[in-house]
């Protein structure tokens, strides 16, 4: 009925979702994100975050109010400032990441980021075997650390 539709629209006015996506091309990948879902670039030499979160704590880190380590434990770490659906004009950020053979890109939600350290991600991906096994290990670590949020991850490697 019309009344039910109006209630659904009203009740979902503050709902939104985060996004991180990548498209591979010959020499690398194009990545986009909105919210606090992230992309990481991983090689045997290390792990680098590609994306920036659209969140209260990321702004606090940028302004020097807290450190990146403090942001991981901050009670407001899940307060995002941009999301798809909530704001019809929400802008996604874009990145171009050149890649060499054997390099990885990890796309993941905050459920993984909040429970698995960058060094754990690096170790599991570089030493974990095939891509499916790496992801299984990361999800196992996240769940064993009490992941309170949903945990989603995608791993790609340049061949």
Show which residues each predicted segment covers.
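A secondary-structure boundary/capping signal
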Residues: 33-35, 53, 108-109, 117
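Short beta-strand scaffold segments in enzyme catalytic cores
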Residues: 17-23, 29-33, 38-42, 151-157
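Conserved, helical-rich catalytic subdomain that frames metal- and/or nucleotide-binding sites
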Residues: 52-101
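Predominantly a core beta-strand signature of beta-propeller blades
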Residues: 46-47
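C-terminal catalytic subdomain
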Residues: 82-108, 112-159
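Single conserved hydrophobic/aromatic residue that forms the stacking wall/gate
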Residues: 1-9
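Glycine/charge-rich, flexible interdomain linkers and switch-proximal surface loops
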Residues: 10-20, 96
């Amino acid at each position: 009925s019309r009344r039910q539709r109006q209630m659904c629209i009203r009740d979902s006015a503050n709902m939104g979702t985060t996004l991180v996506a990548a498209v591979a091309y010959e020499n690398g990948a194009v990545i986009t994100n909105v919210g606090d879902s992230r992309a990481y670039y991983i090689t045997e030499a290390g792990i680098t975050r590609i994306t920036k979160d659209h969140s209260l704590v990321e702004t606090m880190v940028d302004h020097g109010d807290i450190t990146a380590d403090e942001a991981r434990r901050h009670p407001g770490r899940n307060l995002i400032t941009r999301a798809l659906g909530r704001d019809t004009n929400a802008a996604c950020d874009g990145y171009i990441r050149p890649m060499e053979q054997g390099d990885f890109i990890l796309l993941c939600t905050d459920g993984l980021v909040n429970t698995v350290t960058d060094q754990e991600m690096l170790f599991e991906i570089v030493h974990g075997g095939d891509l499916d096994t790496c992801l299984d290990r990361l999800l196992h670590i996240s769940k064993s650390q009490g992941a309170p949020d949903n945990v989603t991850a995608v791993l790609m490697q340049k061949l």
